[in-house]
């Protein structure tokens, strides 16, 4: 049975109480990957996958999930500033559907609006060279996406929602 693909809050209801989550920043050429600790407090960068074919990309992602005992995915969904979904969001949803056919780990979609821009500003502020930024931006965007989702889930849990 394919994994459910849901908005983050609904996906959280399908994940076990404890266990690591993997955060993904999908690009056309790369996939930034971050993983949380089992208590879901901190996102840490794992790697940037150079995209090849879907099956190879998915095999690497699922290997990371097995290595890190991941219980669910947080996939950054690139929503337009007006709230609509453009071609990049459609491509992300297609990737999620394909991935869902290979795993039973619930997939949570999280609005990643401006995540790469925010990370790039931060790296520029840290005086990271353009070449080095290109190497690390996707992993850092995955960290940004996953940490934002973790923080939102923590806020909801604390408020009793």
From Swiss-Prot:
Keywords annotated in UniProt: Cytoplasm, Hydrolase, Nuclease, Ribosome biogenesis
Domain of life: Bacteria
UniProt family annotation: Belongs to the YqgF nuclease family.
Matching Pfam families: RuvX
Function: Could be a nuclease involved in processing of the 5'-end of pre-16S rRNA.
MF terms (GO), sorted A to Z: nuclease activity
GO biological process per UniProt: rRNA 5'-end processing
InterPro entries the UniProt entry points to: RNaseH-like_sf (IPR012337), YqgF (IPR005227), YqgF/RNaseH-like_dom (IPR006641), YqgF/RNaseH-like_dom_sf (IPR037027)
Species for this entry: Bradyrhizobium sp. (strain ORS 278)
EC number: 3.1.-.-
Protein name per UniProt: Putative pre-16S rRNA nuclease
Gene3D superfamilies: YqgF/RNase H-like domain
Any one annotated GO CC term: cytosol
Top-level class of the enzyme under EC nomenclature: hydrolase
Compartments, as annotated in UniProt: Cytoplasm
């Amino acid at each position: 049975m394919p994994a459910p693909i849901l908005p983050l809050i609904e996906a959280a209801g399908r994940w076990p109480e404890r266990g690591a989550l993997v955060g993904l920043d999908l690009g056309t050429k790369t996939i930034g990957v971050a993983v949380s600790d089992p208590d879901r407090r901190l996102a840490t960068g794992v790697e940037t996958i150079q995209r090849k074919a879907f099956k190879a990309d998915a095999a690497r992602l699922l290997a990371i999930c097995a290595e890190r005992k991941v219980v669910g995915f947080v996939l950054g969904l690139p929503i337009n500033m007006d709230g609509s979904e453009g071609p990049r969001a459609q491509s992300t949803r297609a990737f999620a559907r394909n991935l869902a056919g290979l795993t039973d780990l619930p997939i949570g979609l999280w609005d990643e609006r401006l995540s790469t821009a925010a990370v790039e500003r931060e790296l520029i502020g840290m005086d990271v060279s353009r070449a080095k930024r290109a190497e690390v931006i996707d992993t850092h965007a995955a960290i940004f996406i996953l940490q934002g989702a973790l923080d939102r889930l923590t806020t909801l849990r604390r408020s009793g929602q």
